Every structure is written in C-alpha cells, then in structure tokens.
C-alpha cells in the first residue's frame, strides 16, 4: 500500500472535512445549530499547525451503551442496505449487501459478548462496517442512472468524510451519534419513512424476498410446554401473513404427517428413558425438514447441485446435534424454557434472533421446534450455496467434507469465519468447536447419528 506524504494526507482529510461540512449544512441542520466552537474551524487550525490533535477533555463523551449501539447501528445498516439492495436488479450484488448486513450484525453480537469496555461503541461499529458498505455502494452507483445514484453518492460522500474525520474526533467533537446516523440515512430514504433508527424484531417479508429467501416460513405453533413463559415482547406475532405481492414464490410446504410429528415433538421434554423413541422421531423431523427446505429453495431459484443433497441433509442433522443435542427445550430451575446460549442463540438450531431479525418470527424460534428447525435449515442452505460452494471451499484440499466444515464455521461465527477451520493459527476455543462439529458430521455421514444420545446428561444447557 502506498502511503500519502503527510502534507498530502492532511489535504485529503481537509477536503473530506470540507465536503462533510457542506453536507452537514445541507442535511444536518440540527448539528449546524449546536452552540460552541465550530469543529471545522478546529480542523482547519489543526491542519495548518501540524502535529497531533489535542483532545478537548471538557467535551462530554457520548453515553450510548453497548446494547443501544448494537441496536442503533443494526437499524441504520438494515435501512440503508435494504434501500440500496432494492435499487439493484443483480442477485449477486444483493448477496453482497446481505453479506454487509450480516457482518455488521455479527459485529454487534461480538460487541455484546465481550466484557471489555468500549468507550464509543457506536463509533466502533460504524468504523467496522463502513469499509464493507462503502465499496458496495460505490459499485452500485456505477450501475445506476445518474438520478437514481444521486442520493447514494451523497450518502457515500458524507459517510467517507465522517470516516476520515474520526482521526480528529477527540479534538473536534464529531462523534458518531444517533442523530448523525439519522441524518445520513435520510440522505437516501424517502420522506416520511419514519425514524431510520427504529429497532424491532418483527418479521419483514420484504427483507426475505429481497435477499432470495422467499415468503415467510409457515406459521409457528407455540409449544404447550411453555404456557405463558415467553416474554410479552415475544408473544404471538401475526405479521407472518403473506401479502398478495409476496405470494408468487412457493412457500415451504409441510405434509400432514410431518406436521403431526412436529406437534408431538414440540410438546415433548425428553428424559433419558425416552431416548429410544424420541431420537428416531427427531431424526425423521430433521431429515424431512432438510428435504422440504431443499425443494423450497429450488422453487425460488436458489437451487444447489443435486450431488450435494446428501451432504446438506447430513449438515442439518450434525448442526442440530452440535448446537442443542436435538433439543428445543430444557427444564431450568423447575421451569421449561427454550435452550438459549449466553449471547442469545435459541432453540434446536441455536438461531440468533439479533442476527436474523426480520427474516424469522422470534416467538416461533423460541417456542416451536419445527419452526426453529426450518429456520436453521434455511440458513445452512444459504451458507452452503452462497458461501462455501460459491467460494469453492472444497477446491482447496479436494475434499467435499470441507464444504460442510466451512458452512458450519459461518453458521457458528458469521461470514468472516468461512475458512477458519483450515487456518493454522486459530483461537483454541474455535478450533475445539470445529473439531467437535467434524466428529459429529462424520458420525452422521456414517449413519451413526443416533449417537447424539450420548450428550443427553440432564444438564440445563446444550453443551
């Protein structure tokens, strides 16, 4: 990488700051009215004087918590990505925007999982995601006519300038705040679009269709084991009804026999003595879920080559084994509840509601083993098709099993983990997870999937 001379670098930042100042005046009147020294005058002085910026310790620091930052950034990123992807007719381009969205959500999840203090979590998430988002926006503007690209260019220029200005944020008082993100989003969103930082867990059929997932999954049937134990915010949500505009692709169909099996398993909290009956029944449900998902994905134009059908089916069974020991519920402190990890993954397939918000009904993920299984199978199909196969993971060592290993690595850790299983230097905990999964996958491949019974210990957690 060629480094700019110091003077040239300062000039670049100065131009970026000047551009952002212009955009602030046009698009961020609230910021322009703030009392106190003009931060851009401070920038100009710093650039003229040279040397390192001196932080203004009198200026209060932002007070956005990690949780607030994760939700605010997710809301912003989702609205911008959804708008940008909707401007493109290229399915591959849309998948790149989905990659940006999922990566940004995993950034938020990692932020929440870490105990390390982060002084400005919203700024951290902006810096992590902008370098992924900006190139995709820039490429999209080249594919659109000038009028359609105009608002995206405005967002790009403002975002790039804000990114450059972060080098001086302590000195000039230009933190990444919720209001900053609102004004950036409003550069591209239509008038009357509402608060671009509004965050909820409701199902969004538009989001599913935009990224090739098709209509919402069949409605969840909450387990009678839970009674009223689910939080009120997760109560039955009927936003899954498919509007006429979304009825064209074929939904995932569940035959009556499989539906009856799912209802039976959904009201079953197995003990060790139940395993000879419970495990074969769950195997049937998982196999039928994999087969139905395979067919449904084909019907919406997301097919995978037939030679990978068996691999995919084995992948679904082994992932459910790895994630939950084929269970949806456990009894904890005398109360039946969905299996949930420390960072919020839930149910049979340990699906993250935060990562997949908008794609799935959260109450269904928590309260219906069949719904959770269908969601996990759909996510695995996406990662197998659009990541492991698309990026030719099997070609590295010539081993088709690497497709399963790569798919699970992404399922477990997010898009940035695709090839972690073959990296010589890897965190010990991730290496252990990948090794554990491979053992289970190979057992399923050899027809030994009922060995899942060995992990039933009566404990309250899946692992």
PLM features per residue range, with description:
Residues 365-367:
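Short pre-active-site segment immediately N-terminal to the catalytic Zn-binding motif
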């Amino acid at each position: 990488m060629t480094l700019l001379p110091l003077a040239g670098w300062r000039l670049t930042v100065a131009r970026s700051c000047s551009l952002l100042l212009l955009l602030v005046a046009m698009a961020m009147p609230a910021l322009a009215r703030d009392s106190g020294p003009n931060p851009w005058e401070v920038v100009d002085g710093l650039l003229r004087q040279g040397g390192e910026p001196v932080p203004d310790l009198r200026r209060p620091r932002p007070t956005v918590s990690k949780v607030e930052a994760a939700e605010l950034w997710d809301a912003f990123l989702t609205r911008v990505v959804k708008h940008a992807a909707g401007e493109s007719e290229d399915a591959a381009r849309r998948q790149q925007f989905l990659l940006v969205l999922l990566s940004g959500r995993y950034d938020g999840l990692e932020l929440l999982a870490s105990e390390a203090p982060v002084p400005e979590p919203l700024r951290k998430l902006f810096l992590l995601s902008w370098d992924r988002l900006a190139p995709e926006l820039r490429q999209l503007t080249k594919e659109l006519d000038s009028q359609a690209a105009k608002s995206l260019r405005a967002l790009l220029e403002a975002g790039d300038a804000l990114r450059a200005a972060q080098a001086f944020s302590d000195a000039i008082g230009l933190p990444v705040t919720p209001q900053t993100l609102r004004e950036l989003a409003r550069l591209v969103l239509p008038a009357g679009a509402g608060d671009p930082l509004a965050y909820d867990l409701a199902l969004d059929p538009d989001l599913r269709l935009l990224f090739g997932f098709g209509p919402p999954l069949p409605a969840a049937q909450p387990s009678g084991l839970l009674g009223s134990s689910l939080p009120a915010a997760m109560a039955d949500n009927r936003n899954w009804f498919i509007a006429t505009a979304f009825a064209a692709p074929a939904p995932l169909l569940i035959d009556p026999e499989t539906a009856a099996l799912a209802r039976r398993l959904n009201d079953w909290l197995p003990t060790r003595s139940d395993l000879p009956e419970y495990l074969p029944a769950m195997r049937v449900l998982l196999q039928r879920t994999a087969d139905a998902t395979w067919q449904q994905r084909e019907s919406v134009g997301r097919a995978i080559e037939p030679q990978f059908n068996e691999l995919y089916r084995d992948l679904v069974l082994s992932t459910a084994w790895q994630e939950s020991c084929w269970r949806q519920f456990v009894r904890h402190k005398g109360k039946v509840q969905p299996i949930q990890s420390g960072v919020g993954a839930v149910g049979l397939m340990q699906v993250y509601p935060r990562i997949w918000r908008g794609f799935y009904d959260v109450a269904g993920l928590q309260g219906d083993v069949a719904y959770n299984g269908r969601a996990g199978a759909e996510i695995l199909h996406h990662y197998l098709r659009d990541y492991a196969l698309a990026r030719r993971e099997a070609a590295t060592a010539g081993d088709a099993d690497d497709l399963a290993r790569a798919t699970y690595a992404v399922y477990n850790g997010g898009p940035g983990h695709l090839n972690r299983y073959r990296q010589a230097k890897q965190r010990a905990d991730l290496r252990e997870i990948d090794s554990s999964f491979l053992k289970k996958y190979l057992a399923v491949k050899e027809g030994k999937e009922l060995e899942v019974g060995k992990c039933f210990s009566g404990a309250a957690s899946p692992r």
